[in-house]
A protein has these predicted regions:
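Phosphate-coordination loops involved in phosphoryl transfer and adenosine-cofactor binding
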Residues: 70, 131-134, 216
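Phosphate-binding beta-alpha-beta segment of Rossmann-like dinucleotide-binding domains, i.e.
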Residues: 90-153, 160, 168, 297-304
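Phosphate/diphosphate ligand-binding glycine-rich loop within oxidoreductases
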Residues: 31, 50-127
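Structural motif
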Residues: 6-10, 34, 56, 222, ...
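N-terminal glycine-/charge-rich "phosphate-binding" loop or analogous flexible N-terminal tail
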Residues: 1-49, 157-159, 255
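Rossmann-like adenosine-cofactor binding region
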Residues: 60-64, 165-259
Length: 305
């Protein structure tokens, strides 16, 4: 039984050591494909793999078609839009993610981004505090819950909207549940985005929604760039000199947005899960899920049908 770890952006050594211990301890073989630059290297490596672990690497229909023995693929992280779920299902491959393993890392980054932007990117003599501000959490999953926990430490008033999370589950955490996404944006000084990129959410964060936000508003995006209507973001920043946007996913129109100076910031690459702890947690979770699936048929975190 061969487990392939294919990562253009490799795991930390400690994560690989842990993955190896889990995989080989279960009696399986571990193979590594790291820092590959040609997708053909991926095709060749996956050809005889029974299980696959990736990070942000794209598991396309073509990858799946080259993987003649593949039974399971695990995306080490919460988002799984880099997996072609239809292709996996067609080839009877179980696709999983590892929810919750990087949620604290993303939450800490989101909170840090709020401070950075409220201090006008650390411009001396200016800025404001988070204490007393209204924070809206758009999607109350593992990351959203951690953002709420951190924000309450700053003394923020926390609101949340999640169409799939019961009101009671939100409010038991001391967070105010609102009835619609429009209400969330109309109410809050800051909105922290945690929605996945799906056909329903792509470009759903548009001008009409953003323009509901109060004066001096900030949008923090540690989710996916695809959920932002990028042309509308330019329009919003142009029409509302009080509005700010920060993201850890550089948009396609980044150069257009830099004209807005300290009201816009994007990290040079996706940073939410870029901590040693998150890297290790997600890698070990992926390895454990593969072993549990192969040995016991456990499909708890399956994301395809």
């Amino acid at each position: 039984m061969k487990v392939l770890v294919a990562t253009e952006k490799p795991f930390a050594k400690a994560a690989i050591d842990g993955i190896r211990s889990i995989v080989e301890g279960a009696g399986f073989e571990l193979a590594l494909l790291e820092k590959y630059t040609d997708v053909n290297e991926f095709y060749k490596a996956v050809a005889d793999a029974d299980a696959l672990i990736v990070r942000s690497d794209k598991v396309t229909k073509e990858v799946v078609e080259h993987a003649k023995n593949l039974k399971i693929v695990v995306r080490a992280g919460a988002g799984f839009d880099n997996l072609d779920l239809a292709a996996c299902t067609e080839h009877k491959i179980v696709a999983m993610n590892t929810p919750g393993q990087n949620s604290n890392a993303v939450a800490e980054l989101a909170a840090s981004m709020m401070v950075f932007m409220f201090r006008n990117q650390f411009t001396p003599g200016t800025g404001a505090e988070l204490k007393g501000k209204k924070l809206g959490i758009h999607a109350y999953g593992n990351v959203g819950r951690n953002v709420a926990r951190v924000a309450k430490g700053f003394g923020m008033e926390v609101y949340a909207f999640d169409a799939f999370c019961p009101k009671e589950a939100i409010e038991k955490d001391g967070v105010k549940a609102v009835g619609s996404v429009e209400e969330l944006y109309s109410t809050c000084n800051v909105v922290s985005l945690h929605i996945p990129a799906t056909k329903e959410t792509i470009e759903s964060i548009n001008y009409d929604l953003l323009n509901r936000m109060p004066k001096g508003a900030l949008l923090v995006n540690t989710a996916r760039k695809e959920v932002i209507h990028e042309a509308d973001m330019v329009r919003m920043l142009n029409d509302r000199p009080d509005f700010k946007y920060i993201t850890d996913i550089r948009p396609a129109n980044h150069d257009d947005l830099t004209q807005f100076g300290t009201r816009y910031f994007a990290t040079p690459k996706k940073m939410g899960a870029e901590t040693a702890e998150a890297n290790i947690n997600a890698g070990l979770a992926a390895a454990n899920q593969i072993v549990d699936f192969i040995k016991n048929g456990v499909t708890k975190f399956q994301v395809n049908k």
